[in-house]
Design a protein with these regions (language model features):
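Rhodanese-like catalytic fold shared by cysteine-dependent sulfurtransferases
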Residues: 1-24, 30-62, 71-103
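Short, surface-exposed ligand- or partner-binding patches at beta-edge/loop junctions that are enriched
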Residues: 65-66
Length: 103
């Protein structure tokens, strides 16, 4: 783990405690995945739409990037870091792991 990644259990604990209320949680899954279940405080931004939404994202907020298993979110995290975003954190394991810790 580094400053640009967080384990799902640690993320879930912060989420439950309200420690992420000022953060931007970006869910990069597809809409059908989102509809099957998502975090109330998350924003749906499918991976393929991220480039066109760069200008609308707030570089001053910490962003937590989630997907189904942590692969797409890792790629989006790397993309955002490469485009000048510094406060970007990939949630390892994605919703598959997060759900275990929020149940």
């Amino acid at each position: 783990m580094n400053k640009h990644s967080i384990a799902a259990d640690e993320f879930a604990a912060k989420y439950k405690n309200g420690d992420l209320d000022d953060a931007y949680i970006m869910d990069v899954r597809e809409e059908y995945e989102w509809e099957a279940g998502h975090l109330d405080k998350a924003h749906l931004v499918p991976m393929n739409t991220v480039p066109e939404k760069l200008d609308a994202l707030d570089k001053t907020k910490t962003m937590y990037i989630i997907c189904a298993h942590g692969v797409r979110s890792w790629h989006v995290t790397q993309y955002l870091l490469g485009n000048g975003f510094e406060q970007v954190v990939n949630v390892e394991g994605g919703m598959a792991e997060i759900e275990h810790h929020l149940a």
